[in-house]
Amino acid sequence: GNISVVGANEWVSESQVLDIAGQQAGKSILLVSNNDVEKKIKEIPGVTSAQSKKKLPDSLEVTIKAQKPAAMLKTGEDSMTAVDSKGRILNSVSGASVEGIPVIEVKDVETSLSNRSIKEALKILSSLPESMRNSITKVTAETQDSITTEINGGDRVIVWGDSSGLKLKKAVVDKIINDPNVIGDKHNVDVSAPLRPIIK
């Protein structure tokens, strides 16, 4: 049968998806369970949604949504590991650009991924708009409720706290940093309690 893939990107390769769909489809596409295919494909790091459709007589079309890495985990000088918002390691497709992807410095990739503070940081980072992600120069995740992003080399420092109430926190940050009357000559915005933001 024919299997086609729509929506792969430089972090989730078409061949990865084809491999899994092919294993699931086995000999007969007619007998394949869309549900099983979707479930398996969603397990690929970076895939946020998967839809499998049979096209008779013997084709299968898999449509995926693939996200960019939530962050790059940096260990040592040159070692970068891409991870998605769920803390799953992405296999970079060669030539993938890491530009605009926030970097978190960690001692060890495996350990950090089981760490609550890194998990919270990934949730926050993956939810931020591209424009903000592009200008993040440093991410600190000392504890799970003190996630901080530094923008443009410290021109703005945003303390998010944890990933709760993110929508509200993002709205508050947006309002503060884009209003010269509010931010003035200050640099630090703490929205860990979004209803009582602290600007210093």
Go through each PLM region and give its residues.
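Envelope-exposed proteins and targeting segments
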Residues: G1, S13, S33, V37, ...
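Periplasmic polypeptide-binding modules associated with outer-membrane biogenesis and secretion
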Residues: G1-W11, S28-S79, V83, K119-K123
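Periplasmic/extracytosolic POTRA-like scaffold domains at the N-termini of outer-membrane
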Residues: V6-P45, V98, P102-R116, D179
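Solvent-exposed coil/turn segments that connect beta secondary-structure elements
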Residues: A8-E10, K55-P57, K65-P69, G76-D78, ...
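Solvent-exposed, non-transmembrane alpha-helical starts
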Residues: S28-L30, A71-K74, E110-R116, V159-G161, ...
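Extracytoplasmic segments of membrane-associated envelope/inner-membrane machinery
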Residues: E61-I136
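Soluble extracytoplasmic domains of inner/organellar membrane proteins
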Residues: L113-L168
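Extracytoplasmic/luminal low-complexity segments enriched in Pro/Gly and acidic/polar residues
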Residues: G154-K200
